[in-house]
C-alpha cells in the first residue's frame, strides 16, 4: 500500500527479501537483476526513488546490480528481483536436510513485522477520516522499520561461518513460523515439536499485542515477513 509505503523503502525491501533467500541457504548474495513494469501513473521521480532504495540495499550488502529490464504495465507496479549467491559445496543448506533429534532454533525477534503492518494500517484509517492528523510512530519505531525496511541476516551467516557451524536445514520466515516449519518438515520428511514457552517474545511484541488484543503466539506463528 503506497499510502504508507515509500517507494524507496519498497525498492530496498524487494532486494533485501531476495538476499535473505540466499542467506537461508547459508550463502552470500553477490549479484542481483531487477526487472520493473510500471504504469504511466508513476512519474519519473517515483522511479528514481524506487531505484534509490534498490541501490541503497546493494551498497549496504555489497551486491552488484548486473542487469534487468524496465517496461510498461497497463496498471500498477511490478518488481521482479533475481539474486545470485555463492556458498561452499560442503556448507550449502537446504530445506530437506533436517535429521531426527535436531534442535529447532529461531534467530531474531518474531512477529514484529506483522505488528508494524497493523500499526501502519491503523494510522492509515485515522488519516482517511482526518487528513490533518499526524501519526506518532516513534513508540513503534522498531516495529514499523521491521515492516518497511527489513534486513537480511547476513550477520547470522557470518556467525555460523566464524564458529564452523553448518545447520542441517534452514529457511527464512516469510509467512510465519508455522508455515515455514511445515516446509522444513515436509521437505525433510520429518516431524517436529514446538514449545510455545520456549519461543522468545520481545517486550515490544507483548505490549502491542495487548494494545491490539492479539495473541502473541498467533502473531509469531502466522504473522510473517520476519
Where are the regions that the model predicts?
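Helix-biased detector of long, well-ordered alpha-helical tracts
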Residues: 1-226
